């Protein structure tokens, strides 16, 4: 089922949406670069902080899932990551006039994209770039 009620579709859609955002930015001539540490400090909204915190929790979660023989923890993490990304995307504009904020948000999107791709790969699920 292709709806937000299907957790696999929901996670794949988050990945595809990020890929679409990055393509759109590149098509509009935005030069994507790694932001400085000072620029990354601009990621201060509740949605950004929540997303960053969730990204940082992955390593510990993988260890816990392995130690407890509970791969469902990874599945749950992927769903939460998709939800947190969609919440961020609905609350914050990635493309802004403030170059530093924009580059930091692009970097955050890339971190989510890479993490989602890796988590889906652990679950043997494809991460499509478009849907």
Each predicted region: which residue ranges?
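Non-catalytic interaction-recognition regions
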Residues: 1-131
């Amino acid at each position: 089922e292709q709806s937000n009620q299907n957790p696999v579709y929901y996670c794949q859609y988050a990945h595809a949406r990020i890929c679409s955002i990055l393509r759109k930015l590149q098509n509009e001539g935005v030069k994507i670069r790694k932001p400085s540490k000072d620029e990354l400090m601009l990621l201060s909204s509740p949605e950004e902080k929540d997303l960053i915190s969730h990204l940082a929790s992955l390593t510990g979660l993988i260890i816990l899932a392995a130690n407890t023989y509970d791969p469902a923890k990874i599945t749950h993490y992927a769903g939460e990551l998709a939800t947190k990304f969609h919440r961020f995307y609905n609350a914050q504009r990635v493309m802004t006039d403030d170059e530093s904020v924009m580059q930091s948000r692009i970097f955050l999107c890339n971190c989510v994209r890479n993490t989602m791709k890796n988590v889906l790969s652990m679950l043997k699920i494809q991460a499509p770039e478009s849907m």
